[in-house]
């Protein structure tokens, strides 16, 4: 089936030219292009239009779950007749395995899998393998391991009318590709045997399959609604794909066990040779237990650490990911919010490797654990075809590699970028209160950014004392609490949100007409050019948008951010005059789950980051001062590039503390 874009409007403003130029670039064979699109300019519609024009499968990667949910919903509305799939981590809760030597603390892996998200991942894999009209909207989970696409495609069951196959044999085949015999159909991946009928519930479909037998011959194949059991469609032939993302054969398990036994012997000898007898004994005990489980059950806890044995990969070779399910020569990749997504992809491998280093060195895991990992950035680039970076503030990398930078600065709604006003820091709080009162009188909302978590808490408390309904937002609030604060702001039960890094939320708040940036002249992570432009953009969805920069001097970052905002503002104003457009605020329905849809899943990231940061700080005792400082600096810049400014600030403070201690010791 061909992509068929459905929308109640045609491309407007800069969209027609942007679509044409980017499509020409794809057809020309350009490897990298950038769509520089401002907030509210319709970047998602532009991406959808490009997909329809070129008729190629697409992978859209976005940096957080809130944006993924938003994009998934929008692409589904644009392509109701085609397959739009979602591919994010399937964990509701995730505690990664880790070991902190200084505390002799082993943290066991703990996880809860969300059945719905697991089924959606399988649906995505199946769609990519079997269709051309597919858009997959993914998080950075796209660079983490998935099953071998050859196994997923080859280990299917083909059934057709007239085929002879005993029902018990069919049941065994279904079990071999991870279907279980059960009456509970809520999670999919199950089947029933009822007399001459076999009912199968694939996890990737919202309907069941019913196979009618006459003796051992298939007589009829239908799909049916599991709720009312009504027949939906008749089939002559059907293919049943695996019920799980990771499937393998008994032969591969036997071969893997032999390989693991060989590597265990070699690694144990290596540890003993280095005098690490405790570590060698620990490794033998843990690995032999895993091998026993694999031999008897075909599964063990932490089986992913042995994935390269099942995949037949050599040490160091990249894992299979959803990228391997695509035809590289046909796919298009859109990196949404690329100024965040590119650094995020770069950082994933290093964080994973650092955590596993201790597990391997101290005998908790074989070195094969290193090969259950995300792709490196270079491997990611090798795995995909043409890339279009999408951002209002593309990073240096995107700008340097792109054949063309296509601007999309005109908003179809006529909304102009907010007016930016610089005011002195003296009496900045009183001035803001005066400004926010006007906003509240109009029934609108405000955002304020400050430099520290303590300042956010104190400022919000002070506003509440004055009768202004305010809440604070920072990294110590868990995902559910952050979701609730933003929901209150949109509903109107809160007028002001005070935050430190308001970029992490993927905010889309048309009710916000005022953004205030306190101490805007304090150069650093939170006041860089990119951060300022992105924060200014938070007021760009409201006709009364205004931004206050409280500063006693104009920094270079402020100057560039103001100049760029004014350039975009003037272009929109000229367009509005030329086309007689009257600006209108964006009206966006308050979806109950706009931020909540995958909120619980976000815990995985929070927990992984916290464990990893604890691990970095715990390395102080194991490293020389210079090595420790170098590691802290590397991780600080990585956190900054991912816009995790609070983590970056914590690492910076630790660096300064170590430098002060070193200076004292040298006196």
From Swiss-Prot:
User: Where does this one sit in the cell?
Assistant: Cytoplasm
Q: Where is the Helicase C-terminal domain?
A: 428-581
Per UniProt, ATP binds at 37-44
UniProt cross-references to Gene3D superfamilies, sorted A to Z: P-loop containing nucleotide triphosphate hydrolases, UVR domain
| GO terms under cellular component | cytoplasm; excinuclease repair complex
**Motif Beta-hairpin located where?**
90-113
First and last residue of the signal peptide: none
User: Quick check: keyword Translocase in the entry?
Assistant: no
Q: Does the keyword DNA repair apply?
A: yes
Which domain of life does the UniProt lineage start with?
Bacteria
User: Record's Pfam families?
Assistant: Helicase_C (PF00271), ResIII (PF04851), UVR (PF02151), UvrB (PF12344), UvrB_inter (PF17757)
The UniProt record lists the Helicase ATP-binding domain at 24-195
Q: Tell me one GO biological process term.
A: SOS response
Any idea where the UVR domain is? 626-661
- Which GO-annotated molecular functions does the record name? ATP binding; ATP hydrolysis activity; DNA binding; excinuclease ABC activity; helicase activity
Instruction: Tell me which SUPFAM superfamilies the record gives.
Output: C-terminal UvrC-binding domain of UvrB (SSF46600), P-loop containing nucleoside triphosphate hydrolases (SSF52540)
Q: What keywords tag this UniProt record?
A: ATP-binding, Cytoplasm, DNA damage, DNA excision, DNA repair, Excision nuclease, Helicase, Hydrolase, Nucleotide-binding, SOS response
Domain writeup = The beta-hairpin motif is involved in DNA binding.
Q: Which NCBIfam families match?
A: PRK05298.1, uvrb
Q: Report the protein's function.
A: The UvrABC repair system catalyzes the recognition and processing of DNA lesions. A damage recognition complex composed of 2 UvrA and 2 UvrB subunits scans DNA for abnormalities. Upon binding of the UvrA(2)B(2) complex to a putative damaged site, the DNA wraps around one UvrB monomer. DNA wrap is dependent on ATP binding by UvrB and probably causes local melting of the DNA helix, facilitating insertion of UvrB beta-hairpin between the DNA strands. Then UvrB probes one DNA strand for the presence of a lesion.
Family to which this protein belongs = Belongs to the UvrB family.
Can you state the subunit structure given in the record?
Answer: Forms a heterotetramer with UvrA during the search for lesions. Interacts with UvrC in an incision complex.
Protein name (Swiss-Prot/TrEMBL): UvrABC system protein B
Can you name the source organism? Answer: Kosmotoga olearia (strain ATCC BAA-1733 / DSM 21960 / TBF 19.5.1)
Lineage of this protein's species? Bacteria, Thermotogati, Thermotogota, Thermotogae, Kosmotogales
């Amino acid at each position: 089936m061909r992509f068929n874009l459905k929308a109640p409007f045609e491309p407007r403003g800069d969209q027609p030219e942007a679509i044409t130029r980017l499509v020409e670039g794809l057809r020309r064979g350009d490897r990298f292009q950038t769509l520089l699109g401002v907030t509210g300019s319709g970047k998602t519609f532009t991406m959808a239009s490009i997909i329809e024009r070129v008729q190629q499968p697409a992978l859209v990667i976005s940096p957080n779950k809130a944006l993924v949910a938003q994009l998934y919903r929008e692409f589904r509305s644009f392509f109701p007749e085609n397959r739009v799939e979602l591919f994010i981590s399937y964990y509701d809760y995730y505690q990664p395995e880790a070991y902190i030597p200084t505390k002799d603390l082993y943290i066991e892996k703990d996880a809860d899998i969300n059945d719905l998200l697991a089924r959606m991942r399988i649906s995505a894999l199946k769609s990519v393998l079997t269709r051309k009209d597919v858009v997959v909207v993914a998080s950075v989970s796209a660079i983490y391991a998935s099953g071998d696409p050859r196994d997923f495609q080859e280990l299917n069951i083909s059934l057709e009318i007239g085929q002879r196959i005993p029902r018990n044999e069919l049941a065994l085949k279904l079990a071999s590709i991870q279907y279980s015999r059960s009456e509970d159909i809520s999670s999919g991946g199950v089947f029933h045997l009822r007399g001459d009928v076999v009912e199968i519930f694939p996890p990737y479909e919202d309907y069941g399959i019913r196979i009618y037998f006459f003796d051992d011959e298939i007589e009829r194949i239908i799909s049916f609604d599991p709720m009312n059991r009504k027949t939906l469609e008749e089939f002559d032939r059907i293919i049943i794909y695996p019920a799980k993302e990771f499937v393998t054969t008994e032969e591969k398990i036997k071969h893997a066990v032999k390989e693991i036994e060989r590597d265990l012997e070699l690694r144990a000898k290596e540890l003993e040779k280095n005098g690490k007898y405790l570590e060698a004994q620990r490794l033998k005990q843990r690995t032999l237990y895993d091998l026993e489980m694999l031999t008897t059950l075909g599964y063990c806890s932490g089986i992913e650490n042995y994935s390269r044995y099942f995949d037949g990969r050599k040490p160091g070779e990249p894992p299979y990911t959803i990228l391997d399910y695509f035809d590289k020569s046909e796919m298009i990749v859109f990196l949404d919010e690329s100024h965040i997504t590119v650094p995020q992809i770069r950082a994933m491998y290093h964080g994973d490797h650092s955590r596993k280093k201790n597990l391997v060195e101290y005998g908790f895991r074989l070195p094969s654990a290193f090969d259950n990992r995300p792709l490196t950035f270079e491997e990611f680039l090798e795995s995909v075809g043409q890339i279009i970076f999408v951002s209002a503030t593309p990073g240096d990398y995107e700008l340097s590699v792109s054949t063309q930078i296509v601007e999309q600065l005109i908003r179809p709604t006529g909304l102009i970028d907010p007016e930016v006003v610089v005011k002195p820091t003296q009496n900045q709080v009183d001035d803001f209160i005066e400004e926010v009162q006007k906003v509240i009188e109009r029934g609108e909302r405000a955002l304020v950014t400050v430099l520290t978590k303590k300042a956010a808490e104190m400022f919000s408390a002070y506003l509440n004392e004055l009768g202004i309904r305010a809440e604070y937002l920072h990294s110590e609030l868990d995902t559910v609490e952050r979701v609730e604060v933003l929901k209150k702001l949109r509903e109107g039960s809160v007028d002001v949100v005070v935050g430190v890094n308001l970029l992490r939320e993927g905010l889309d708040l048309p009710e916000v007409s005022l953004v205030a940036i306190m101490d805007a002249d304090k150069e650093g992570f939170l006041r860089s050019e990119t951060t300022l432009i992105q924060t200014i953009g938070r007021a760009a969805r409201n006709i009364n948008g205004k931004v206050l920069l409280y500063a006693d001097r104009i920094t270079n970052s402020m100057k560039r951010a103001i100049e760029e905002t004014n350039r975009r503002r003037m272009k929109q104003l000229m367009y509005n005059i030329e086309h007689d457009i009257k600006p209108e605020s964006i009206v966006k329905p308050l979806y109950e789950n706009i931020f909540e849809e995958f909120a619980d899943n976000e815990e995985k990231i929070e927990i992984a980051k916290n464990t990893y940061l604890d691990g970095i700080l715990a390395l102080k005792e194991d490293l020389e001062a210079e090595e420790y400082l170098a590691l802290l600096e590397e991780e600080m810049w990585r956190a900054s590039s991912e816009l995790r400014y609070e983590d970056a600030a914590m690492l910076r403070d630790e660096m300064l503390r170590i430098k002060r201690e070193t200076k004292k010791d040298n006196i």
